[in-house]
Amino acid sequence: MNILVIGSGGREHAIINSISKSNKCSKIFALPGNGGTELLAENLSGDVNDFELIKKISLKNKISLFFVGPEDPIVNGIYDFFKSDPQLKDINIIAPSKQAGLLEGSKDFAKDFMQKYNIPTAKHKTFSIENIDEADKFL
């Protein structure tokens, strides 16, 4: 099985390190990867938000499993992109949908979600430059 890991941080290195130990893994690709991932995977150059490039890489390298580490491509909808494309929909992708990614990508969305479902969290309120005086009072 060929695996693609998106990202360049410590999280992605840890994922690659773990999956490199599996006998089910034929080849690992990292986009863009880092110096540590280079020892375990083939680093590829490219932008983690260039979904068309990631599609080409996935098809060319017969990717079966795809991990997404960074928040940015998740919030930008990489899971939804893969699942809506007939050529990519059968690739297993480890990432939340764009909507679910908002829990990590938007603190305002996450706080509203927690309040709506009675999940314990610190008090919050959203402010803008127009209501800065309210922000001072809130604090």
Feature-to-residue mapping (PLM):
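ATP-binding N-terminal substructure of ATP-dependent carboxylate-amine bond-forming enzymes
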Residues: M1-Q99
